[in-house]
């Protein structure tokens, strides 16, 4: 009986871990989609739909090595606090900012 309970417990744990992996995998895709949607609605007007910036506005090219070499903390700080003419997005949660940084990283050349 005790051996059966151990096997049942191990199977339950394995099922829970598998379910958690599946849930987090789909969540990550949703977060990427959410970050892309936020980029399109809040950022693309100045940074361009492709993230390459707009020369007339002197906005940075997110695909450039100069932007891509910045640390996640630096990019997060600019998103959260703004810089120059860029407004601060203080209402974004830390997870949303992290997802936006990941999206910006995906734009590299």
Predicted regions located by residue number:
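Short, flexible, glycine-rich and Lys/Arg-enriched loop motifs at helix boundaries
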Residues: 54, 66-69
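Periplasmic c-type cytochrome electron-transfer domains
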Residues: 2-15, 47, 69-74, 89-106
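Short non-domain terminal segments
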Residues: 21-22, 37, 60, 101
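PAS-family sensory/regulatory domains
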Residues: 62-64
